[in-house]
Amino acid sequence: MPMKFEFSFSKSHRPAGGAAVLLQVAGAKEAAGAAVVDPEGVLAKAAKIGKFTGKALSTLDVIAPHGSPADRIVLLGLGDAGGVGDHDWLKAGGAAAAKLRSAEKITVFLDAPGLEVTGKAAADFALGMEMNAYGFESYKTRKSDDEPKAAQKPVKVTIVTGTVIAAKKAFMTAQAVGEGVFLARDLVNEPANVLGPVEFAARAKELERLGVDVEILTEREMKKLGMGALLGVAQGSSRPPRLVVMQWKGGKAKEKPVAFIGKGVVFDTGGISIKPASGMEEMKGDMGGAAAVTGLMHVLAARKAAVNAIGIIGLVENMPDGSAQRPGDIVTSMSGQTIEVINTDAEGRLVLGDALWYCNDRFKPQLMIDLATLTGAIMVALSNHYAGLFSNDDRLAEQLLAAGLATQERLWRMPLGKEYDKMIDSKFADMKNTGGRHGGSVTAAQFLKRFVKDTPWAHLDIAGTAMGSPTDEINQSWGSGFGVRLLDQLVRANYES
């Protein structure tokens, strides 16, 4: 069972047993809190013997010496004082949580000598602990005999810092971010037999308790709008599609909204162009873009962001059936443009095409950003470490790249151009839904570009980062929640009034 934490912040605290975490920068003579938990100065000798130098994320775990009010002491390195950024505090918190799986109470001495510690740093450290401890075990009925008692109830964590008031305020925002990330992770991790389009829409509807206006369009309503591209993907499944429109109105009344659009294929068999059996179970995560948009809308509402934001998610299931669309079919999108379906496994762009057009036509946003686990080609290019960024607007692209660096949800800008656009021209329709294997992620983006007009737009291909990416200090989950922190940072830095 994943650990749960109950945090408090204090200017001073003397532990009464439990574990104490002492932070130290590289080259410092002592760690934060050493005078409290190590009155005899034993830690310095232990650090020398253990060759602990304060290197980033390095640890030294010792039984508390005689006279210490703690039972266990963990020295945790932060690295060079001049290089400690926001993300480093998250990772440090994650490293602490990973080290203290069996702890029943924890005291963290945060104010490392030689380092200026802010309230946000304290909040980020706490969020890092929570992000590391996240787990998805809803369907496990057998618990291991050696499961720590700490997992049964919240572990009390006292963070000792001189910035208590600022830390408490920052932690309220950090908690909102964490909730959004965990919502996205939960949605991606959920099995497809439980989370269909209707059930996903119901989860999104729950955001109304935070003040989000949620509207759910049915199949009949989408037919009236002419969403033939999205509906073509859904027609092979017995589970009806949904289009969910989420509105957060935290900005000025007449201020144009920022819009986020997510691909929500709750399970992707590939349709008639069926995928190989090996690994197909992972296609329950083909709604990672929709999960990220839903998580983001939770964050914006929970922290009362001063922005008008739209979240739109197209929810379908792509199944082979007697009524499923075939290669060679031609569908008419909401835009009026016709599309020849070459490969039914290139379905996400069909869903997004209608969703993008609907968003632009109805809301006239100042920008649109779509997120999608769209192509395997982006994983060939970037592996699991970067998401692909495609954009028709340099300013928006630069803002996204900066947000990626700040959150370490990193993006790499990919090309767009007329040469690639020609690759999706069709002999029989206005366009075809795939341009072949070469440049597959680029031609997919070019397809989407045909549905955005002149609105500043960016497409994030998160196929390699939304699920199955390498674990690290702040993510031990298969579904990562990628994109939630990235886009919250984008909004926070550029679009809040």
Curated annotation (Swiss-Prot):
- PROSITE patterns, sorted: CYTOSOL_AP (PS00631)
User: Catalytic center at which residues?
Assistant: 275, 349
One MF annotation (Gene Ontology) recorded for this entry: manganese ion binding
Q: Which reaction does it catalyse?
A: Release of an N-terminal amino acid, Xaa-|-Yaa-, in which Xaa is preferably Leu, but may be other amino acids including Pro although not Arg or Lys, and Yaa may be Pro. Amino acid amides and methyl esters are also readily hydrolyzed, but rates on arylamides are exceedingly low; Release of an N-terminal amino acid, preferentially leucine, but not glutamic or aspartic acids
Record-level GO cellular component terms: cytoplasm
- The answer to whether UniProt assigns keyword Manganese to this entry is yes
One GO-annotated biological process of the protein: proteolysis
Protein keywords: Aminopeptidase, Cytoplasm, Hydrolase, Manganese, Metal-binding, Protease
Report the enzyme's class at the first EC level: hydrolase
Residues noted as binding Mn(2+) 2 in the record, renumbered to the chain: 263, 268, 286, 347
Tell me which SUPFAM superfamilies the record gives.
Answer: Macro domain-like, Zn-dependent exopeptidases
Record-listed E.C. numbers: 3.4.11.1, 3.4.11.10
Does Manganese show up as a keyword for this record? Answer: yes
Tell where it localizes: Cytoplasm
Which positions are annotated as binding Mn(2+) 1?
Answer: 268, 345, 347
Co-factor note (free text): Binds 2 manganese ions per subunit.
Task: List required co-factors.
Answer: Mn(2+)
Q: Entry's InterPro entries?
A: Leucine_aapep/pepB (IPR011356), Macro_dom-like (IPR043472), Peptidase_M17_C (IPR000819), Peptidase_M17_leu_NH2_pept (IPR023042), Peptidase_M17_N (IPR008283)
NCBIfam families recorded: PRK00913.1-2 (NF002073), PRK00913.1-4 (NF002074), PRK00913.2-2 (NF002075), PRK00913.2-4 (NF002077), PRK00913.3-5 (NF002083)
Any idea what job this protein has? Answer: Presumably involved in the processing and regular turnover of intracellular proteins. Catalyzes the removal of unsubstituted N-terminal amino acids from various peptides.
**What family name appears in the similarity comment?**
Belongs to the peptidase M17 family.
- Record-given protein name: Probable cytosol aminopeptidase
What is the source species? Rhizobium meliloti (strain 1021) (Ensifer meliloti)
Name of the coding gene: pepA
